[in-house]
Amino acid sequence: MTGAIKPVFPLASNTWDGAEEAAIQAVVDSGMYTMGPKVAAYEKAFADYFGSQYAVMVNSGSSANLLMIAALFYTKQPYLQPGDEVIVPAMSWSTTYFPLQQYGLKVVFVDVDIDTLNMELTKLEAAITPRTKAIFAVNLLGNTNDYGAIKQFIDGKNITLLEDNCESMGATYNEKQCGTHGLMGSYSSFFSHHMATMEGGCIVTDNEELYHVLLCLRAHGWTRNLPKFNQVTGEKSDDPFEESFKFALPGYNLRPIEMSGAIGIEQLKKLPSFVEQRQKNGQYFQTLFHNHPYIAIQKEK
């Protein structure tokens, strides 16, 4: 029986140190392993860092995309209905697309620009029809979309802008964080991404109703994580038993574990240095493959 082959180029390097290890140990010592106060503290820090009103942590970036799409069906005035068209780039990770298909939406693919690997703007504009209800923009491999142009395309139209920012945490467009240009944005903290929380994802929004819907859908559709006055059920009962077992929406269980929240608090402090190092790595590869006869590399926008 042969042992595992060690890769020449690892997928990612470890960015944890004593701070993350101490955070994990503190959770172990507390005896509270499921989603709790550390996750809540991370969500507050995450929202503050990226300039959003609300952040909801989940167990992966893929779960963030699923929850984000689901939430658009469960507001009082739904943003989406089955059969609506949603425009997406032709290049992304699979779980950008699968939630759209799972909710009965018509996925409209737009080809990407060969240099930036984001949606080619003239093709994006041409893809918009009266049936288009959302654009799900993906900031691929650190490159931001041209949100000025995209917002011009949808100005005056009933089209929702969403962002899959799982691969571009820390990128900005016009000094505004990517993930915050649309109604909602998703992030990933998988171990090879900009921050590593073992597994993890996050959604940001400034919309209070969507925030409440996300909280409900994230954990079984129950009401126990909602504030007393909320936009899903109105006013909650003061009876804790009643609210602990009241299910208002057809939810999932996408909760993160408490350790991931604790690690995220420490990783978020280091994010600027992580982004800086990744930019240096990107510049190195751009130089290395410049004018290569067989390899075309993504160009920074």
Question: Where is each model-derived feature located?
Answer:
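N-terminal "arm"/small-domain region of PLP-dependent enzymes with the aminotransferase-like
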Residues: 1-32, 37, 248
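Phosphate-binding glycine-rich loop
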Residues: 32, 36-85, 99-103, 109-111, ...
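PLP-dependent aminotransferase class I/II
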Residues: 39-44, 52-56, 61-62, 122, ...
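PLP-dependent aminotransferase-like
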Residues: 74-140, 144-165, 172
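Phosphate-coordinating loops and pocket residues in cytosolic domains that bind phosphorylated ligands
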Residues: 102, 180, 216
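Conserved active-site segment immediately N-terminal to the catalytic lysine
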Residues: 163-197, 212, 243-246
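Adenylate-forming
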Residues: 197-200, 262-264
